[in-house]
From Swiss-Prot:
This is Uncharacterized protein C4B4.12c. GO terms for cellular component: cytosol; nucleus.
């Protein structure tokens, strides 16, 4: 069985691998991902069973107020960064094109 801490590491590692190319900076900190979007928006992306997007407040870094909740990391990034959304849709389009060309070549072989 995966413990809560292990699951957190799995979630953060997955997001880093999948989405770090879509932002200016993504770093794993002690218990959150530090994000800087291409629009220079800085935030903490925190996983605790669901994703929380918490803008970094330079005047009060220890602010305990909860951020906005999201069902997935990519939905948090897409809603808060138009540049990430463009990148993500481009990635999706490329994958669909590859799948389309793969299925076409399979039909040709039949």
């Amino acid at each position: 069985m995966v413990s809560g801490n292990d699951q957190q590491v799995i979630e953060y590692t997955s997001v880093l691998k999948e989405f770090s190319d879509g932002v200016d900076l993504m770093e794993l900190k002690e218990n959150f991902l530090y994000i800087r979007t291409r629009e220079k928006i800085e935030a903490k992306l925190i996983w605790a069973g669901e994703w929380e997007w918490k803008p970094v407040n330079e005047t009060n870094e220890n602010n305990l107020e909860r951020g906005r909740q999201y069902p997935s990391a990519n939905s948090a990034l897409m809603e808060n960064s138009p540049e990430f959304a463009k990148w993500f849709h481009g990635q999706l389009f490329n994958r669909l094109c590859v799948l389309g060309s793969t299925s076409s070549s399979r039909k040709d072989m039949l």
